[in-house]
Regions:
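SF2 helicase/translocase ATPase core recognition
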Residues: 37-65, 164, 179-265
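A structural signal for short hydrophobic/aromatic patches embedded in well-ordered alpha helices
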Residues: 1, 17-20, 59-63, 168-169, ...
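Conserved P-loop NTPase motor "coupling/switch" region that bridges the ATPase
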Residues: 1-33, 223
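Generic recognition of well-ordered alpha-helical segments
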Residues: 19, 23, 27, 59, ...
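Conserved protein kinase catalytic domain
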Residues: 2-6, 21, 88, 92, ...
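Hydrophobic aliphatic residues
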Residues: 5, 27-28, 64, 95, ...
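Short, polar/flexible loop-turn hinges at active-site or ligand-entry regions and domain interfaces
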Residues: 8-13, 70-78, 264-265
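Conserved Helicase C-terminal RecA-like lobe
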Residues: 35-61, 74-191, 261-262, 268-286
């Protein structure tokens, strides 16, 4: 399979991809959410591009320089997965919560500054919201901001038991609270939070299907309003590269399986990259 199709995977118009779709389609019976739940309100997705603060940009560029030195001579055949993942995670931390990367960081954080403007405006217009992040430290920072502004919220991470999650869901959907903060992996499935009509993904994840499942905590049976999904993306950084990987993966899935396809496994593309591809992933483009 890899020998025959791998080089065609990034080209959705490839004849080989068309042939692959014809091969697998007789064995797949799929009914997408859009086909089954035609009565659901609209879901509108938008990427909001955020410029790093001056201090963040300086920190980001310094670490990129260091990371490139560490990866020079990289051989994807060697078991360097943990090293690559650690480097990319640190870059993502700088984009979202620089204090997680450097506890002495005291500069501005672009996304937090944006949230300070967004949240009051969203709530004052009668909306209620879910905010997802993969970093517990980031959720804590957002939590502090909500408390400063006296915003009523619920919080869910992996430590919250199923019974308590269901209780939070019940309270929120009955009108209690204005915001639910959720770690992406803890809240990706099983929760009904149709009391929210705005979903914010504070930091992007490699696999679009995981984010879609999280967004669908609000966009599901019982939702009466259109749902707005907002992804916060720092300009020129690893986050824009993640979005590109998401889009490529989505296009491939849709070409082979059809619209709304995808699985919930984390993307492994980064572990198949060679040194040149990793250097491009690390580059700051603006």
């Amino acid at each position: 399979f890899r020998k025959k199709y791998k080089n065609s995977l990034n080209n959705p118009d490839s004849k080989k991809i068309f042939n692959l779709k014809n091969i697998v389609s007789p064995f797949i019976l799929r009914r997408t959410k859009n086909e089954v739940l035609t009565e659901l309100p609209e879901k509108v997705e938008n990427n909001m591009i955020v410029e790093l603060s001056k201090e963040q940009k300086k920190l980001y560029m310094a670490y990129v320089k260091r990371a490139k030195k560490e990866l020079r001579g990289f051989n994807k055949e060697e078991n360097n997965n943990l090293k690559v993942l650690a480097i990319l995670t640190k870059l993502r931390q700088i984009c979202n919560s620089p204090q997680l990367f450097d506890e002495n960081y005291t500069g501005e954080v672009a996304k937090i500054e944006l949230l300070r403007e967004m949240i009051p405006d969203i709530l004052e217009n009668g909306h209620r919201m879910i905010i997802f992040s993969q970093f517990l430290g980031t959720l804590e920072e957002i939590r502090e901001e909500l408390e400063k502004e006296n915003v009523e919220y619920f919080y869910i991470d992996g430590s919250i038991k199923s019974k308590e999650r269901m209780e939070i869901s019940k309270k929120f959907n009955s009108g209690e609270g204005q915001v639910v903060l959720i770690s992406l992996k803890a809240g990706g499935t099983g929760l009904n939070l149709t009391g929210a009509d705005v979903v914010i993904h504070y930091d992007p994840w490699w696999n679009f299907a995981v984010e879609n499942q999280a967004s669908d905590r609000a966009h599901r049976i019982g939702q009466k309003k259109s749902v707005q999904v907002i992804k916060l993306i720092t300009e020129g950084t690893i986050e824009e590269k993640i979005i590109k990987i998401q889009e490529n993966k989505r296009a491939l899935s849709e070409n082979i399986l059809g619209k709304d396809s995808g699985n919930n496994k984390d993307s492994k593309e980064i572990f198949e990259m060679d040194e040149k591809e990793l250097m491009e992933l690390l580059s700051f483009e603006k």
